[in-house]
């Protein structure tokens, strides 16, 4: 899942080397914390959050962690 998120986000940002993805796993959910360069935050979120919503939709649709709910937190 980290590779999927990184490949999507890397094509959007100017500083792909500064992409950091941390995974926090709990009983019923998995949270991926995405951190990018401050200049790239707007590109990842997009106008009215459209790009962030599209990334989240792809991540949610490709979940591989069984019955756990997946969340993507963009910082």
Curated annotation (Swiss-Prot):
Domain of life: Bacteria
GO terms for cellular component: cytoplasm
HAMAP family, sorted: KhpA
UniProt protein name: RNA-binding protein KhpA
Locations listed in the record: Cytoplasm
CDD domains tied to this protein: KH-II_YlqC-like
GO biological process: cell wall organization; peptidoglycan biosynthetic process; regulation of cell shape
Matching InterPro entries: KH_dom-like_a/b, KH_sf_prok-type, KhpA
Organism: Oceanobacillus iheyensis (strain DSM 14371 / CIP 107618 / JCM 11309 / KCTC 3954 / HTE831)
Similarity comment: family membership: Belongs to the KhpA RNA-binding protein family.
KH domain ranges (all copies): 29-75
Keyword Phosphoprotein on entry: no
GO molecular function: RNA binding
Primary location recorded for the protein, binned into one broad class: cytoplasm
Transmembrane segments: none
Subunit architecture: Forms a complex with KhpB.
Keywords, ordered alphabetically: Cell shape, Cell wall biogenesis/degradation, Chaperone, Cytoplasm, RNA-binding
Task of the protein: A probable RNA chaperone. Forms a complex with KhpB which binds to cellular RNA and controls its expression. Plays a role in peptidoglycan (PG) homeostasis and cell length regulation.
């Amino acid at each position: 899942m980290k590779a999927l998120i990184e490949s999507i986000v890397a094509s959007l940002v100017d500083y792909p080397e500064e992409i950091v993805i941390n995974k926090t796993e709990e009983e019923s959910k998995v949270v991926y914390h995405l951190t990018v360069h401050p200049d790239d935050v707007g590109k990842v979120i997009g106008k009215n959050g459209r790009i962030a919503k599209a990334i989240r939709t792809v991540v949610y649709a490709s979940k591989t962690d069984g019955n756990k709910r997946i969340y993507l937190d963009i910082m």
